[in-house]
A protein has these predicted regions:
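Gly/Pro-rich active-site capping loops and adjacent beta-alpha segments
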Residues: 1-59, 122, 131-170
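N-terminal leader/propeptide and maturation segments of large enzyme subunits in energy/redox metabolism
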Residues: 46-122
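Cysteine-centered functional microenvironments
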Residues: 128
Length: 170
């Protein structure tokens, strides 16, 4: 996976990108084993920082494209292939192949609701009707799971520099 760190080095950009790629990669899918090899590249875009979502978009794009390619190669509907691989509610709490823990979530329930709201079952008919009118119609599916924080713990330091002073660094 290639992570875009932007136009110049900000000190921790490479760490943010690579950590989030691994943390986000399984998303909502039950993937028992995984390995990530990633590289960071400089580009003409904004520099990467903690608030730019670095690594998350790359990971989501990667896993969703792999699933779409597998669906194309096997002839299995893309929604069905995703459905078969979602983390079941009875597996929560769930630990990913990269050690992240999901403490809640009904991924199949949310997925089915999204498909119903999009009328995924009726898409083939809409596509056929659009083609008769000379229009092309497509549909895409993607699942996304946001991880909170890059580190498993937070840190603070309390020091007493002397006298009646206390210094708290967070």
């Amino acid at each position: 996976c290639i992570g875009n760190v932007g136009a110049y080095f900000t000190g921790i950009a490479h760490f943010i990108v690579t950590t989030h790629i691994a943390g986000c990669l399984p998303t909502v899918y039950d993937i028992p084993q995984a390995q990530v090899n990633s590289r960071c590249v400089f580009s003409n875009t904004l520099p990467t920082g903690p608030y730019r979502g670095a690594g998350r978009p790359e990971a989501s794009y990667l896993i969703e494209r792999v699933i779409d390619a597998a669906a194309d190669q096997t002839g299995i509907d893309a929604a069905e292939l995703r459905r078969r691989n979602l983390i079941a509610p009875d597996k929560i709490p769930y630990t990913t192949a990269f050690g992240n823990s999901y403490d809640s979530g009904d991924f199949p329930g949310a997925f089915e609701r999204a498909l119903a709201l999009a009328d995924y079952a009726g898409f083939a008919a809409r596509k056929k009707a659009a083609k008769k009118q000379g229009r092309l119609r497509g549909i895409g599916i993607g699942c996304y799971l946001e991880i909170a924080g890059a580190f498993p713990e937070e840190a603070a330091r309390i020091t007493f520099p002397g006298g009646d002073k206390v210094l708290v660094s967070v």
